[in-house]
């Protein structure tokens, strides 16, 4: 790196001399560029020094380094209070207590798995921070609760669609096949311009909304696009929405 910079400097010295003789105010024009080149050279020198230091310190295998040495080398600070002796905290359990723990583990896993399933969303709810970033002229009279209610209906539809698409031919009911045929027709109209099969159109969501929210659906779309909850693709007279 150093030889490369030096060679460039030597080649440009003659050009600088010619420019100084023929161009007025050349020094004031070229001085910022020269300072930038000097800063780049300093950065390259620092990088070369760090590389050499890394090669010198890591000639041996990493198995020879202790955890503290590795943290010091990487610049990781470990507080003394966070270091805990695990062996000292291990307490021998009796057979009765271990049996109770084993019987309670399945129940705890069952309880913890339910919220995880409910938390899985294709279109997540809008947070307060995201709602505040939406311009007021787009929101109008829309509130966070109204927006999240519309988002929840979108998520319900896409979750239902995802489940139907994940079924095998034997698992599909007659109504499922009719819905699939309609979706395939829409995919043909989209002309393969959609990046996903999980999409919806306005007529899919409007019937799911309450009467007071149906007029607000069109106003909610620009707001949801602003916070990147959904994207849209116009194909002829239809507008497709997808997360």
From Swiss-Prot:
<comment type="function">
    <text>Component of the SKA complex, a microtubule plus end-binding complex of the outer kinetochore that stabilizes spindle microtubule-kinetochore attachments, promotes alignment of chromosomes at the mitotic spindle equator (chromosome congression) and assists suppression of the spindle assembly checkpoint. Kinetochores, consisting of a centromere-associated inner segment and a microtubule-contacting outer segment, play a crucial role in chromosome segregation by mediating the physical connection between centromeric DNA and spindle microtubules.</text>
</comment>
<dbReference type="GO" id="GO:0031110">
    <property type="term" value="P:regulation of microtubule polymerization or depolymerization"/>
</dbReference>
<comment type="subunit">
    <text>Component of the SKA complex, composed of two copies of ska-1 and a single copy of ska-3. The core complex associates with microtubules and may form dimeric assemblies. Interacts with ska-3 and microtubules.</text>
</comment>
<dbReference type="InterPro" id="IPR009829">
    <property type="entry name" value="SKA1"/>
</dbReference>
<keyword id="KW-0158">Chromosome</keyword>
<dbReference type="GO" id="GO:0000776">
    <property type="term" value="C:kinetochore"/>
</dbReference>
<dbReference type="GO" id="GO:0000940">
    <property type="term" value="C:outer kinetochore"/>
</dbReference>
<dbReference type="GO" id="GO:0005737">
    <property type="term" value="C:cytoplasm"/>
</dbReference>
<dbReference type="GO" id="GO:0008017">
    <property type="term" value="F:microtubule binding"/>
</dbReference>
<keyword id="KW-0498">Mitosis</keyword>
<dbReference type="GO" id="GO:0051315">
    <property type="term" value="P:attachment of mitotic spindle microtubules to kinetochore"/>
</dbReference>
<keyword id="KW-0493">Microtubule</keyword>
<keyword id="KW-0206">Cytoskeleton</keyword>
<dbReference type="GO" id="GO:0000278">
    <property type="term" value="P:mitotic cell cycle"/>
</dbReference>
<feature type="region of interest" description="Microtubule binding">
    <location>
        <begin position="119"/>
        <end position="243"/>
    </location>
</feature>
<feature type="region of interest" description="Disordered">
    <location>
        <begin position="95"/>
        <end position="116"/>
    </location>
</feature>
<dbReference type="GO" id="GO:0072686">
    <property type="term" value="C:mitotic spindle"/>
</dbReference>
<dbReference type="GO" id="GO:0051301">
    <property type="term" value="P:cell division"/>
</dbReference>
<keyword id="KW-0137">Centromere</keyword>
<comment type="similarity">
    <text>Belongs to the SKA1 family.</text>
</comment>
<dbReference type="GO" id="GO:0005874">
    <property type="term" value="C:microtubule"/>
</dbReference>
<dbReference type="GO" id="GO:0007059">
    <property type="term" value="P:chromosome segregation"/>
</dbReference>
<dbReference type="GO" id="GO:0072687">
    <property type="term" value="C:meiotic spindle"/>
</dbReference>
<protein>
    <recommendedName>
        <fullName>SKA complex subunit 1</fullName>
    </recommendedName>
</protein>
<dbReference type="InterPro" id="IPR042031">
    <property type="entry name" value="SKA1_MBD_sf"/>
</dbReference>
<dbReference type="GO" id="GO:0005876">
    <property type="term" value="C:spindle microtubule"/>
</dbReference>
<keyword id="KW-0132">Cell division</keyword>
<feature type="compositionally biased region" description="Polar residues">
    <location>
        <begin position="95"/>
        <end position="112"/>
    </location>
</feature>
<dbReference type="GO" id="GO:0007080">
    <property type="term" value="P:mitotic metaphase chromosome alignment"/>
</dbReference>
<dbReference type="Pfam" id="PF07160">
    <property type="entry name" value="SKA1"/>
</dbReference>
<keyword id="KW-0963">Cytoplasm</keyword>
<keyword id="KW-0995">Kinetochore</keyword>
<dbReference type="GO" id="GO:0051988">
    <property type="term" value="P:regulation of attachment of spindle microtubules to kinetochore"/>
</dbReference>
<keyword id="KW-0131">Cell cycle</keyword>
